[in-house]
Amino acid sequence: MHSNGTMLLLYALASIIILILMIAKWRLNPFVSLILVSIGMGAVTGMPLTKVLSAFQDGLGSGIGSTASVIALGTMLGKILAESGGAERIATTTIKIFGPKLIHWAMLVIAFIVGIPIFYQVGFILLIPLVFTLGRASGISLVKLTIPLCAGLATVHGLLPPHPGSMQCVEMLHADVGKTILYGFIVGFPAAILAGPLYGNWITPRIQLPAHNPFAESLEGSSDQDKNLPGFWLTIFSILLPVLLMVFSSGANIFLPHGNNIRAFMNFMGDPVVSLLIALLVSMVTLGFWRGFSSADLLKFTNDCLGPTAGILLLIGAGGGFSEILYRAGVSNAMADLSHVMHLSPIMLGFIIAAVIRVATGSQTVAMSMSGGMLAPIIFSTPGFHSPELLVLSIGAGSSILSHVNDGAFWLLKEYLNMTVSQTFKTWTVSVTIASIAALILTFGLQALGL
C-alpha cells in the first residue's frame, strides 16, 4: 500500500483516539467533540476548510435524514403505549409466559423476528419502550434486557435480506436469496445468542447505570397502575403494524414486477416513516380515544416525550458528519487496499474488507455494498469457489464488527441507557464484535460442510 494510504489510516486512528479522550476523559460535549475532530481530520488530510465544513454538513444531514422522523414517531408511539397501559400489558404477559429469569431471552427472539424487515434504528426505537417497561416491572437491569435486543437487531440487519446491504451483496455476487436467508438464520441466531443473552449475563453486573434515566421517565405512564389494561393482542398489533407493513413491502418487491401499481403502493406504505405514522395514528384511536383519552391528552403525551430525543439526533447527525469526512478523505479506500493485498480466501477477504470499511465509515450498509462491489470480479475469477451465499454472510459479519463513535447506533444506545462512552464500548461494541466473529466462524463451518 502507498505511504499516503498508510498516513490516512494513522490520521483516522489518531482522530478516533482523540475523540474518545475528548468525551471520556476531558468531558467535552460529544457533539462539540465530533465537530472538532471532523474539522481536524479534514484539515490534516489536505481538504480545504470550506469543503471540510460542507462535507460535515452533508454527512450530518444524511445522518439525521429520515432518522429524525423515525425517532420522533417511534417515541410518540412508545409514549402512547405506555400511557394507555399497553406496554405494561405486554410486560406483565411476557413475565407471566417466560418468567423473570427468561425475559432477556424473550427480548432476543422478539428482536430477531421484528428486525427482519426493518432497519436497526427503527426496531430499536420501536422496542426500547418495552425494555423500559419490562425492566420497571421485573426489576431486571436495563443492560441485561437491552443487550439481547441490540444483538438480535444488529445481527439480522447485517446478515439477512431484505436489508439493503445484504440485498446489494446478493445481487452483485449473484447469490441465491432463499439460500442466503436460510444460511443467515443458521449463522445469525447462534451468533446473536452469544452476543446477546450470554454476554449480557456476564457484563450486566459490571455496568452500573445512573438511577436517573430521562428517556425511561419520559415514556412512563402517568395513570394508575390498577386501571383496566388494554388487551394483549391489541397492543401487540399496535407494535407489529409497522413491521407488517414493511414485510408486505418486501414481499411486493420479491413477487411483483417493477412498475406494478400495487408494488409501488406497498413500497410507500412500507416506508419506515409512513408505516410508523400509520401505526401512531391507529394507536391514537385504539389505545387513545377508545380508552377515554381526549385530543388534549394525546397532544400532551406526544409533545412531552420529544424533549429527550434532541440530543441523540444531534449525535447521530454529527456521527454521520464524521463518517463523511473519513469517506471523502479516502480512509475507507485505504483500508480496503490494505486488505486487498493480503492473499486470503474469498470468505476471509470479504470479512476483512467489510470490517475495515465499517470501522472507517461507521455504516454497515456502506461496508457491505462497497465490499460486494470490490469482491465480485475476484470471486468470478476464482476457480473452485461456488458459495456466493457464504461470501454474503462473511461480508455481513465483517460489517458488524467494532461499532464505535462514528456509528449512530453507538450513540443511540449510549443516550437511551444514559451510559458513559466507556460503558457503551464495553456493552455495545463488544457485543456486536462477538456476534461478528461468531458469525464468521459459523460461516466457515458451513463451508466445511460443503454448502
From Swiss-Prot:
Its main location: membrane. Keywords: Cell membrane, Gluconate utilization, Membrane, Sugar transport, Transmembrane, Transmembrane helix, Transport. Pathway: Carbohydrate acid metabolism; D-gluconate degradation. The chain crosses the membrane at residues 4-24, 30-50, 62-82, 108-128, 140-160, 180-200, 229-249, 270-290, 306-326, 337-357, 375-395, 430-450. The keyword Cell membrane applies. It is a multi-pass membrane protein. GO terms for cellular component: plasma membrane. It is found in: Cell membrane. Pfam families: GntP_permease. One of its GO terms (molecular function) is gluconate transmembrane transporter activity. GO terms for biological process: D-gluconate metabolic process. Belongs to the GntP permease family. PANTHER family: GNT FAMILY GLUCONATE TRANSPORTER, TRANSPORTER, PUTATIVE-RELATED. This is Gluconate permease. It comes from Zymomonas mobilis subsp. mobilis (strain ATCC 31821 / ZM4 / CP4).
